[in-house]
Amino acid sequence: MKTIYRIAKTELNTMFYSPVAWVVLVIFSIQSSWKFFDTLERFEKSQKMGQNMDNMTQVLFSGFSGLFTEMQNYLYLYVPLLTMGLISREINSGSIKLLLSSPIQIKDIVLGKFLAIAGYCLLFMAILGLIGVSAYFCIDNLDISFVLSGIFGLYLLVCTYAAIGLFMSCLTSYQVVAAISTLVVLAGLNFVGKLWQDIDYVKDLTYFLSISGRANEMIEGLIVSKDVLYFILVSTLFIGLSIFKLQTGRDAQTVSKRVLKYTGLVVAIFSLGYITSRAPLTFYADMTRTNDRTLTKASQEIVKKIDGPIKITTYVNLLDINYYMGMPYSQNQDFASFDKYSRFLPQIEMNYVYYYDTSTNVDLYKQNPGLNDKQLAEKMLETQDIKLKKLYSPAEISKIINLKPELNRVVRTVEYNGKKTYLRMYDDFFKIPFEKEISAALKRLVAPTVKIVFATGNMERSIEKNGDKNYKTGFNEITFRHSLINQGFDVASIDINAQNIPQQTDVLIVADPKTQLSQGAIDRIGRYIDQGKNVMLLGEPETNTALTPITAKLGLGFTKQTLVQESETNAPDYLVTEVAPKIDSSVIKLNKVLYPIPFLGSSGITITKNTDFKITPLLTTNKQPTWESASGISSVSEDLKKQPSAKAIPLVVALTRKTNGKTQKIIVAGDADFISNAELARQGSGTFQFFTDVFTWFSNYEFPIDTTRPESTDNKIIASTNQVFITKITFIAIFPLLIIAAGAFILIRRNRR
């Protein structure tokens, strides 16, 4: 070890007796400081303008344009300048012969050289660390462990670059060639992860070799053993190759022996890398303050209940618009989207089944008129150069699974302990399911589901249609991730006039019947309520009399006419509601609604008699005067203003009572439109939040899965504008000048000697 340290010390002296080391240090210092403090300055100005800050540590250091993310993209440019002369300088000057003929072991020479460059790279990390220290005094409650995780990841990355540069320096006596060769190898390692991803086994090898994004997890606050070991193994590989290369100059070796040594090293490194990257052997350390990179507590409680094999099968329709997400070349990325779960469930098995069938990909059919599904599939295989072991025809896939209800879209099934559920892709920017959707699917396999049944037969709102007034978006839209069918609920319909309510029903919804309920329907609903089951009743001013036999049983009624308010911008029946004050949280827990919840044409809820239900208003009209009027008026007339008005009229009420050992829950609303397709899609509305809270309550807070995390505490820049500016100047100008002065002093002093 002493020899290694002596060589490292000598190499460091040589490096710092060259202007290159000082210039690189100055450029790195200016570049990193400029990036960080320029961003900090912009956020400080935004904060002064009243913009809320959130999670500032992650925003400034990671993300799309944080300090560590940006510097990761530039580190590869610095390393070749530092490593190009490590060995090539010795080869060019002839001193390599003296080294090889000395009693010093080759491994000591190589390790000493690597230790020197690794020591120099610590200066890069020291600069980033100083920026982190300054951030500690600028940001309230800076997440220190998060910053340290990022620095650790970047250090491993730059040391791996250095090991590669060291090996390339062994191959040539020309320093420029060594630098260029290093850049070429680094580019290759960044690109190799995209090669041959459609070939089994080979794709795992190339994916392992890829250095692209390897430090991302650590930059984002998650230290993963397979990434740490990757950097160590790749560094070991190139250090070993460097030792073998220099040994050929000292020892006479046959070609076969050389090949065997190189092959053995490469195979050993690849084997170790493959083994240690498997899920059961991967370990994690979440360095974020709020464990952002780990499953939430609710999700962890779900996965704890899974103790056996679990299989995820992705059915990929070649004609679907999302087909590429399940192709062989995308599978490694697809596996990565389940990393949070494989951490706790290493036994997850993922399979892919490919088929073709009629799809909803309208553009594909427009662009290829006259081709049937089989011809389209053949064309896709040919033009996209897709190679599949098996592509099922419509007839063949239908024998395996019926995907017609899923519109033949790319979809997954999750199977555990004999139960199966769907996990879908969605028509939004991200497409893939997130923790909320994945955990909901898993919970359906280990816990009872919540079944919502809609009453039909009296022209009620439909969960199958897309019109503005219908209910498909919130309940039964498979392409919308927030629809309840994708959040753990089962949704069905029955003809209430002819069919009994299923025994397993958890919530019965009667939404705006436009004709009178039959006596049979009234009796069925009455018996259902008497059993202590949950109900949601939604009426409209013109048709709510159809619900009177039910609401009367509950001791409630509707106002006789539509509620209206005077407004300069909206129609009179456009009501801006308010969440009722002081709602008892033991009755229902509502999240804070940040946006108004509009009601377009609503009746008020009245109490007609005392019952054993506890009645809790949830939404009311605001504090403006409200009158009753016939529907369809264009303005509030002077005559109407003379009529008695009211304020804070209940529009949605919750009824609760203890029965059969559990709490019965009922919602009655004077407006059936407020959870319609159109209203749930309205921008700037709090309707969807309220809608979700209500059904979370109905499910006893089991679904949707609560994936909220503790609020971040690093939400404020505590440094003033002047302090940020002074710190910026210190790091961008004064600190680099000090480095230049130190470098100049050392270089001049050496020249004088």
Ranges and model annotations:
Residues 39-62, 178-252, 618, 633:
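Terminal transmembrane helical anchor/hairpin motif
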Residues 252-280, 286-311, 435-451, 459, ...:
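Extracellular ligand-binding/catalytic regions of CAZymes and related secreted enzymes
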Residues 1-78, 82, 247, 251:
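Hydrophobic alpha-helical transmembrane segments
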Residues 472-703:
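Acidic, S/T/G-rich, low-cysteine, solvent-exposed domains in lumenal/extracellular/periplasmic regions
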Residues 34-37, 55-72, 111-172:
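Secretory targeting signals
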Residues 80-100, 114:
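Transmembrane helix boundary and interhelical loop/hinge segments in multi-pass membrane proteins
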Residues 20-30, 175-190:
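Pore- or pathway-lining transmembrane helices of multi-pass membrane proteins that form conduits
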Residues 278-416, 422-431, 435-441, 449-500, ...:
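Juxtamembrane extramembrane loops of integral membrane proteins
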